[in-house]
From Swiss-Prot:
Gene symbol of the encoding locus: grpE
Described function: Participates actively in the response to hyperosmotic and heat shock by preventing the aggregation of stress-denatured proteins, in association with DnaK and GrpE. It is the nucleotide exchange factor for DnaK and may function as a thermosensor. Unfolded proteins bind initially to DnaJ; upon interaction with the DnaJ-bound protein, DnaK hydrolyzes its bound ATP, resulting in the formation of a stable complex. GrpE releases ADP from DnaK; ATP binding to DnaK triggers the release of the substrate protein, thus completing the reaction cycle.
Family: Belongs to the GrpE family.
Protein's GO biological process: protein folding
Keywords: Chaperone, Cytoplasm, Stress response
Protein's UniProt name: Protein GrpE
One GO cellular component, as annotated: cytoplasm
UniProt xrefs under Pfam families: GrpE (PF01025)
Known partners and oligomeric status: Homodimer.
GO molecular function: adenyl-nucleotide exchange factor activity; protein homodimerization activity; protein-folding chaperone binding; unfolded protein binding
UniProt keyword annotation of Zinc present: no
Length: 191
């Protein structure tokens, strides 16, 4: 009987040992799974942070490019403003210049009138020199081909000596500031 009892005790010890082994293995598996879950969560967090970093870097680069574009546009606007700063003044002076031209077109035999006209011509020439310094110039007209960008046709002519679409007379001078037309020339164009 004692052998049976020993066998039972050994068997019970073996079962208990087996249960402990299984319990240990289960605990190890749970710990490994927990560690794997933690690792997976950390990897997911790292991936999420990397994506956010990429997004922020892209936004930064776009903002930097936008800033550069605004800067270039500002410089271009400032340059254009500087380039065409005298346009308004020139437009205001053109009627006075036209009046000078009409006055200078008159003739007189009186010495006083001739002296006044000479003084007016000097003032007129000074205005033209000031215009030239600012880049304002007369648009060529008579003998040129009609260009709707620079000329405004107000009359037609039928001169056999002039070519087709050639300007035969200028009724009012046109002016341009650098590459911008301030006032187109009013012209008579041959058919």
């Amino acid at each position: 009987m004692s052998e049976k009892k020993n066998k039972k005790e050994r068997l019970a010890d073996e079962i208990e040992q087996e249960e402990l082994n299984i319990l240990d293995e289960t605990e190890e598996t749970v710990e490994e799974e927990a560690a794997a879950d933690t690792l997976t969560e950390e990897q997911a967090k790292i991936l999420e942070l990397e994506n956010k970093l990429d997004e922020v870097e892209n936004r930064y680069l776009r903002m930097q490019a936008d800033f550069e574009n605004v800067k270039k546009r500002h410089i271009a606007d400032r340059d254009a403003s500087q380039k065409y700063r005298s346009q308004s003044l020139a437009q205001d002076l053109l009627p006075a210049l036209d009046s000078f031209e009409k006055a200078l077109a008159t003739t007189s035999d009186q010495e006083e009138v001739k002296q006044i006209l000479k003084g007016m011509e000097m003032v007129y020439n000074q205005i033209l020199v000031a215009f030239e310094k600012e880049g304002i110039e007369v648009i060529p007209a008579v003998g040129e081909q009609f260009d709707p960008n620079f000329h405004q046709a107000v009359m037609q002519d039928s001169d056999e000596n002039a070519g087709s679409n050639e300007i035969t007379a200028e009724l009012q001078k046109g002016y341009k500031l650098k590459d911008r037309v301030i006032r187109p020339s009013m012209v008579k164009v041959n058919q």
